[in-house]
Amino acid sequence: MPHISVPAAELNTRLDRLRCAMTEKDPAWSMLLLDNTLDMYYFTGTMQDGALVVTPDQATLFVRRSFDVAKDESAFADIRPMGSFRSIKEVYPDIPETVYVAAKTMTLQKLSMLNKHLPFAPKPMDGVLSGLRSVKSAYELDCMRESGKLHRYVIEELAPAFLREGVSEARLCSEICTAIVDRGGMGISRYNQPAAEDVLGIASFSENSLRPTALDSPSGCIGTSTAMKSIGSSERTLHEGDTVLLDIPCGWRGYHTDKSITFYYGELDKHPQSGVIRAAREQCIALENETASLLRAGAVPAEIYEKILSLVDPAFREGFMNGCKFLGHSIGLTMDETPVLAKGFSAPLESGMTLAVEPKIAIPGVGLIGCENTYEITADGPAQSLTGACDTLFEVLNQ
């Protein structure tokens, strides 16, 4: 059975917004070319090997592989087969001296291949692309709400039963991800960061959750090996007295939600630092709730970040966010979009933006304690959680 396609009206609206944003950036722009599959999906509803060319009055998706699949699953108006980049020049014979591209993903190798047939100087348009994606349409919000419902169900209702004596981090993460995929989840996490990889998520026990990865995230993980700092260790197994950090994303029709939770496996009162663990948990819950109350259209991300930092208990400031300099991040087609709840982000929030809020506290000798949920900025009133509550089940008795 074929997958549900992105509606034609949605694609047309995105193309109109792209042209308006480009004209605002450069009234004299005449052409842009996108070769990244994620950008291609956003504007055409399909991910193929090819290139999307847009001018003020024309737009064509050129596909090397697979043209038939692209025609089958995309409602984009003009899709053409491409033998080589020469095919673009046959449709667009007057290539301008300057063509806008996504500089973050356009490689020198791809640019060299393009320039063999299309002699142009590239100019970056990454800010336009991230700006367009930061405000979600009704269609995109529906996808994220569906992701959030599934996410909440699996993490809050199913995951506690997966915690058992002797289960490894890797198996636990895999079982949770399988539960998501079995119910229609996407099965992948996409990132903008070059240091990030498209992976399942992480399950980390106790001090393993403090081990930093190359990804700019407070959540730590020892990984499956030195070559993969994600998912979890197949050797580290769960035992009574462990904290369990689950930071496992969910996706629905291309759109992600982010949620993390910390469990304690056993009776928390028996832990020598039970008081500190409880205090850290309560602090993170309070900080997430306060952040959610501040996430309103017109609010400034940098100001929210500074406000929340001022509320962190002095006893937890050194370990707050495990060394990371942000509190939350925009999310959508990738896990790490803009804006970010951090210094330097001064543009006001807008209705339709979606952000993950993830206060976490590193406790030496214990692990990373915290919570995370994805929120939708509404036209009026505080943000709405798409992924459930932050005050969820924490203590799981030995099964």
Please provide the spans of the model-predicted regions.
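Active-site neighborhoods and metal-handling regions in enzymes and metal-associated proteins
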Residues: M1-Q399
